Amino acid sequence: MSEVKWDKEKIKSILPHREPFLFIDEVIEINGTEKVVAVKNIKDNESFFEGHFPGKPIMPGVLIIEAMAQASIILYYICKPELAKTHPNYYLGKVKAEFLSPVVPGDKLILETINVKIIDEAGVVDALARVGDRIVAKANFVLGIKKNEPHEILS
């Protein structure tokens, strides 16, 4: 196991996402090419709380999946750094998810991703989202990449 601390700038150098759609604040653990653990701190003023739900804010499940998917991209980057450096387009081919408990303002969302099988342009990743010891969601992703042509790469 490797204890690490990647800040938001390091994360932005890997993920194509930006605020308000960047759902990883830090990476706290990397275990070789097997596991990545990341954190999203859920703030009171997150824009999605305005409508989901007024007076009883709950993080939408689809955004928990997005956070787990972003952690999975970081795992992919660690497994395939040379391919990842070409800034490919990432996509989810299949998602199987289960939601177990709500995520609310003030929660520290821990995102664990496990490499089931990552090959050149695709992978299968198991993901778990938790707050403390409470599991809030589980997912299995089949993800893929589409290589960009040199003129398509965003700088």
Protein language model features and the residues they cover:
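HotDog/MaoC-like acyl-thioester-processing domains
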Residues: 3, 104-107, 115-155
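Hydrophobic beta-strand-centered segment that forms part of the acyl-chain substrate-binding groove
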Residues: 2-5, 72-110, 136-144
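Beta-strand-rich interaction surfaces with strong enrichment in secreted/lumenal proteins
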Residues: 12, 55, 98-101
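N-terminal leader/capping segments at the start of a protein or of a new domain
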Residues: 1-29, 155
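Catalytic strand-loop segment that frames the active site of acyl-thioester-processing enzymes
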Residues: 19-59
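Conserved positions in beta-strands of structured domains
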Residues: 25-28, 100, 112-116
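Compact, glycine-rich, soluble single-domain proteins
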Residues: 50-74, 91-92
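Hydrophobic core residues within well-ordered beta-strands of beta-rich domains
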Residues: 21-23, 109-110, 123
